[in-house]
Amino acid sequence: MFSNIGFPGLILILVAVLILFGPKKLPEIGKALGETLKEFKKSTKELTDEAFQEKEKNK
C-alpha cells in the first residue's frame, strides 16, 4: 500500500501533518502513534505464539 510513497511523498505528508496539527501537538501525536504500534506488535506476537503453540499441540 505504502510502497509507492517515496521520500518526496513522506516530506509532503510530514508538512501536511505539521500544518494541520501544529508543532505543539506533534510530540503528543508521535507518542500516541508509538504506543499504538507497540501494542499492535505485542498483539501480533501473542497471536503468532498462540498459533504456533496450537500447531505444536496438534502434532
Swiss-Prot record:
NCBIfam families: PRK14861.1, tatAE. Keywords: Cell membrane, Membrane, Protein transport, Translocation, Transmembrane, Transmembrane helix, Transport. One of its GO terms (biological process) is protein transport by the Tat complex. Gene3D superfamilies: 1.20.5.3310. It comes from the Bacteria. Disulfide bonds: none annotated. It is found in: Cell membrane. It is a single-pass membrane protein. Part of the twin-arginine translocation (Tat) system that transports large folded proteins containing a characteristic twin-arginine motif in their signal peptide across membranes. TatA could form the protein-conducting channel of the Tat system. This is Sec-independent protein translocase protein TatA. Forms a complex with TatC. The gene is tatA. One of its GO terms (cellular component) is TAT protein transport complex.
